[in-house]
Amino acid sequence: KRSGWKDSGGKMKYDQTIITQKGLVVHIRNGVASDGSIVLENFHLTHAETDYLRTYPDENHFDAEQESRYLEKKVTSPNEIELIAFVDGKVAGTAGIDAIGAQYKVAHRAEFGISILKEYWGLGIGRALTEACIQCAKAAGYAQLELDVVAENARAISMYQTAGFVEYGRNPKGFRSRNAGFQELISMRLEL
């Protein structure tokens, strides 16, 4: 498999079109400022469709202009990235890596996050975005990629394990859902 990561003068750059195991053509690339409104719309849709993400749509205080600035910041970052997966020109999902911190003791660690529109679940887009973020994290020099996942989200846990992530802890009351009460979070990490 060809890497989509490119060295772009100290900036994280990713651009690749792939065909998933299910035969879906997916274009994955950096989110850029002009994507602000479509990424924001995708955020609201994905966060309304599932109880597995950290926030609810009504808790988001970003507008399209702020989302554009956020994406622009990511485009110019040497060690953080926000990727968008497109299927037939439509945003199917987003994923990204964020530095845990700049301090020496934690500079080797990054956090991974992902959200996929429900209509695209099980089609390989999550796997493709996860693999792309792993490539980018390695290229940025991280030694460890981390995530939290709701324990009931068996499909995501299986995908993360297939990608090499291992469980290192649990928080029985990690999330408090409006619908399900407390949800257990599993902390996972991938050594790069």
What is the meaning of each model-derived region?
Residues G10-L24, N179-L192:
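Terminal substrate-recognition subdomain of acyl/acetyltransferases
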Residues K22, E41-D58:
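Helix-loop element at the rim of GNAT/NAT acetyltransferase active sites that forms part
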Residues V26-I38:
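A short beta-loop-alpha structural element at the N-terminal edge
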Residues N60-E119, T130, E191:
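Acetyl-CoA-dependent GNAT
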Residues L123, R127, A139, E152-R170:
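Conserved active-site alpha-helix within GNAT-family acetyltransferase domains
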Residues T130, A137-D148:
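Conserved GNAT acetyl-CoA-binding A-motif
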Residues E146-V149, Q161, V166-F182:
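Conserved catalytic-core motifs of GNAT/GCN5-like acyltransferases
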